[in-house]
């Protein structure tokens, strides 16, 4: 007799019930077993626990109070240390302080998922293999603009390019430099321009984002050799990288600054954003918006569109304009196909 394969929803219900059983049987801290409230920062988020860095640099694995539903790497928290370690846990997180900002992405089942918080800079990692996608870069930039977090575009694996190919890539990156974004070409393999990346990362907290296979783990191995992040090969079939990071982590860099490494994301969806928010994600549109003939202008075939007129005059790059409409269209298609919880 053949075995029936569980559907995604069935598997999720089984996992949820298993988690509830574990939670009910999990040790509960009593108040008299806990010390004074301290300040700390979340440096690793696990499924059921989180690692907190105390002000003295000590890393403590903690339970979360049941009232805390969404704790992420980068959060500043208040926590209390236990009188002893119990079941591998040494403390409990009591509360999360207000966030300066947060980086979120949509999840097909769980609505908006916050990935990290209190970020000073988003490092968008792209690569020349299998192909440099400006559409994906634009997708990330829309997220950065809506989150209000500065972005640095990093192109890895340039050692694979010929001199002619490098010149072509520089022309593509100039599209972003001309509208105020910083870009950097480097190679984690040869170390080319890694010193420049060090300088960009030296202040504040940065986060690496990018599709799997662009070399985020290889870059971390260069920046932090002692970490030995697992690197993955490119799939010969799909051309996509294999996921190599399983949990978001915050690292302290030797030259100063902090780095958050997040799991590889093959599709950073935008269907949680409105078309207006995607439009606001294009920084070069901002001085022109409001000048269209019609207030509900879709910036496509509408008569009197100021954005389209700016493209025709060479004030807005046509590749960016084309990608803008591709993002709007892909958002509408994806949202109509998925039951998305907001």
Swiss-Prot record:
Molecular function GO labels: GTP binding; GTPase activity; metal ion binding; rRNA binding
CP-type G domain: residues covered: 100-268
Entry superkingdom: Bacteria
Record-listed Zn(2+) binding positions: 292, 297, 299, 305
The keyword Flavoprotein is assigned to this record: no
List of residues binding GTP: 156-159, 210-218
GO CC term (a single one): cytoplasm
EC number: 3.6.1.-
BP GO annotations: ribosomal small subunit biogenesis
Group of enzyme by EC: hydrolase
Cofactor(s) annotated in UniProt: Zn(2+)
Pfam families membership: RsgA_GTPase
Keywords: Cytoplasm, GTP-binding, Hydrolase, Metal-binding, Nucleotide-binding, Ribosome biogenesis, RNA-binding, rRNA-binding, Zinc
Alphabetical list of InterPro entries matching this protein: G_CP_dom, NA-bd_OB-fold, P-loop_NTPase, Ribosome_biogen_GTPase_RsgA, RsgA_GTPase_dom
Subcellular location: Cytoplasm
Function recorded in the entry: One of several proteins that assist in the late maturation steps of the functional core of the 30S ribosomal subunit. Helps release RbfA from mature subunits. May play a role in the assembly of ribosomal proteins into the subunit. Circularly permuted GTPase that catalyzes slow GTP hydrolysis, GTPase activity is stimulated by the 30S ribosomal subunit.
Subunit structure: Monomer. Associates with 30S ribosomal subunit, binds 16S rRNA.
Protein name per Swiss-Prot or TrEMBL: Small ribosomal subunit biogenesis GTPase RsgA
Lineage: Bacteria, Pseudomonadati, Pseudomonadota, Gammaproteobacteria, Pasteurellales
Gene name for this UniProt entry: rsgA
